[in-house]
UniProtKB/Swiss-Prot annotation:
Keyword Plastid recorded: no
Active site (catalytic residues): 219
GO molecular-function term, one example from the UniProt record: hydrolase activity, acting on ester bonds
Protein name: Succinylglutamate desuccinylase
Cofactor annotation: Zn(2+)
Cofactor info, note text: Binds 1 zinc ion per subunit.
Principal EC category: hydrolase
Top-level taxon in the UniProt lineage: Bacteria
BP term (GO), one: arginine catabolic process to succinate
Gene: astE
Species for this entry: Vibrio parahaemolyticus serotype O3:K6 (strain RIMD 2210633)
Amino acid sequence: MTKSLFRQSFLTDTLDVHIDVAPAEQVLSNGVQLKLYQRGVLEVIPENPTQETKNIIISCGIHGDETAPMELVDSIIKDIESGFQKVDARCLFIIAHPESTLAHTRFLEENLNRLFDEKEHEPTKELAIADTLKLLVRDFYQDTEPKTRWHLDLHCAIRGSKHYTFAVSPKTRHPVRSKALVDFLDSAHIEAVLLSNSPSSTFSWYSAENYSAQALTMELGRVARIGENALDRLTAFDLALRNLIAEAQPEHLSKPCIKYRVSRTIVRLHDDFDFMFDDNVENFTSFVHGEVFGHDGDKPLMAKNDNEAIVFPNRHVAIGQRAALMVCEVKTRFEEGELVYD
């Protein structure tokens, strides 16, 4: 048996800051190639890649305390090493912020998932990570066809949700809402997808905007520590991800996800800002038209549509940052292979 690249596993080695992680390569008996570039960054190359081969970035740990995706990724890589998991797609697995994971916190100095725009930012540990990730994305997608590029950025929600799993599709100037991507969501039993209506500064948006990748930010359950995640509730997602890596057709039934459009973004403008609900309110809590749910200065925050729902509410953000998304359920269709809505 070929000696493993890892002392214990991809995840365990990534989080063991007492050992050095040097670049290393390995070719498995089935011809699959593994390339460990640095701590938390592993490329997996199928035996016979072509120009049609999917090139998939599977990232997790952008927020250090969101650990369920790390456990799923670690299990998949173990099965790739053993030969149990078939590999027909070229993949880049990323555990982005091990130091934050070890501290059991989302970030150390600044929210990493708000640093992927082209604005000037103050130097922080997270900014250095974002700069490194941008280079990894550039190098991974180099000399590949745009239609083959995917990026699944895996997260967990910090609060309860009416939808245990959901995804956010970034808004870009490119066609990045393909039928294949929606089919993947349905196969993974992701309960809902939010269709963003404006650019953002997230990791998945960066890949979609700059490299035309089929990209999603995926929220998989609730934040928990390693070993305490309810992975049994993510079985369909795990199967769908494994099928994507193997370029295999799913054997289980799909479940169509609910589509939401982002009706507006609430940005905090004043020191005097608050919501009328507590911090435990669930994502996708809805309001009736005209219902007031907070204030920003002397301006009331109210629902502008019936059943308008709130996602990612955070009263503690700095002035100028997003305090919530407001979303409405929407009917969609495909035009020329792309998901659209009126």
